[in-house]
Amino acid sequence: MTTERTDVWRGSIRIIELTMLWGAFLQLGLRAAQNTAASPPQAPQTLSTPSRIDPKAQPLLDGVIRALGGPAFLRFKTMTTRGRVYAIEDETTAGLAPYVSAVEYPDKRRFSYGKKQPVTLINNGDQAWELDRYGQTSQRPEQVYRWKVSTRYSMENLLRLRIHEPSVLIQPGGVDFVDNVPTQGLDITEPGGTHVRLDLNRQTFLPVRITYRVQNPTTREWDEFSDVYGDYQNVQGIMTPMHLTRYLNDERVSETYRNSARYDEDYPAGYFQPTG
């Protein structure tokens, strides 16, 4: 083969190679454009603002956690109590019944009350049932509303979950007297305006009262709940209130007297379902 023909042949090969390479680039570019068009643009990730704690409030938070049992209080998962519950209407006892309560935090409970033919209330997140001798039914909306609000701001969930949620503001509050007990307040404000006040015993740092103001989803009016805790006893290293009184809009609506309490008991599978 002559040198001239060889050069021509090599030039042809290079042209073919460049053409194939350019075609590959075009194909890759087309695929990238198709993928870009098929996939919607991703929104930039935003970091949640952590809770904001006033430096003067931090010692109060540390004190109440320590008083309640420190790590033992922070780590337990279930609580089983037995005792008596009073329903109160117009400051008159409307009902009295023995009860058994099983709670798996943060939002599951099985609450049975009554003697011969007990009624059982089961809550599992947004699901809520009532079981009695006639069978199974759904809890009334007002029951569900009160349960969800009261468990969200219970002493356990407030101090283990709520105060750590994004954008929560925690500040020291004023001093007060609750049931003749001198208290120091902590003001907790959630995004959206819900305000919670935690009153601590000034000597022991144990919670005496939790007050929370929540907008009723049905009436759109603001309801003020107040839970008063007393008669603390050491149970498995955790200071446990054995007497609880609940107020709604300044009216006493229930009282609970616990005879016994146990932590971290195991419950059967499906215990927080109506078939459990």
Residue spans of the language-model regions?
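Short, conserved active-site entrance elements at the starts or edges of catalytic domains
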Residues: 150-187, 207-211
